[in-house]
Amino acid sequence: MPRPRSGPTRKPPYDPSVAVAALSAADPKLAKLIERTGPVTLRLPSQQSPFEALAESIIYQQLHGKAAATIHARMLASFEPLCGLGNHPSPQHLLDCPNEQLRSAGLSKNKMLALRDLAAKTLDGTVPTLAAIKKMSDEDIIEHLIQVRGIGRWTVEMLLIFRLGRPDVLPVDDYGVRKGFALTFLGLKPTQKVTPDLLATREQMERRGKKWAPWRSIASWYMWRACDLAAGKIVQPQ
C-alpha cells in the first residue's frame, strides 16, 4: 500500500460503512478479518490533476518516503520563480526546463525522461484532465495512463484507489494484497517465511473478488490490513 503523504485529506466519495456491510455479508471469512482490524480509516489527499498526481508517483517510485518527499519538494521549489510558492509546474514548464534543474533536485535520468513524457502526453491529450477522468471507467483510465513512460498498471490502480477514490479496484499484482489474501484465505501463517508459491495467484484473487464487487478497493484495503495485523501493527478491537 502506498505510504500516505502529508497534507490535507478528504473522505472517499462513497460511504465506507456501506462497503463494509456489503463485504461482510458477501464473504464470512473477510467479515472475520474486518472484525479483527476495525473500520475503514482510508482518507484521500486533496484533489490533484492526473498530471500532478502522476508526476508525484514517478518521483516516489522505488524511493523511501522521506527521500522522495525531499526530492519532490526541491523540484517544486525550483519552479517557484515561474509558478509561485507551493504551486505545481505546468506540463509546458516541465518540458521547457533544462535537465540540470531537474537533476539538481535529485531526479535520475529515467525519472526526468518519464516526467517529460508525462508532460508531453498531458499536452497532447493522452493524459486526461481531472474533469474528463471523472467520467471515464477504471479500465479506460488505465489504458490511457499506462502509455506514459514509467507508468504501469499498478501505479494507475493506486491512483484509482488512493487519489480518485474508485471503489471497485482489485490490484492482483500488488505484493501486499497477495500476501494479505494468503493470510486470510489460504492458511499462510504470520510467522511463516513467504515464498512466491505461498502467495495468492491472479486467478484465485479474481475468482474470490467476484464476491466483493462493487467494493473491491475496500476488500483490497483489508488485505493490506491483514499484513499489518500479522506484523503486529494493529491493536485488535476489544
Report residues per predicted region:
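C-terminal accessory module of base-excision DNA glycosylases/AP lyases that mediates lesion recognition
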Residues: 1-41, 138-139, 153-238
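Alpha-helical scaffolds flanking conserved acidic
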Residues: 49-53, 89, 93-97, 205
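Generic alpha-helical structural context detector
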Residues: 56, 73, 77, 116-120, ...
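Alpha-helical ds-nucleic-acid-binding substructure associated with the helix-hairpin-helix region
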Residues: 63-64, 68-149, 213
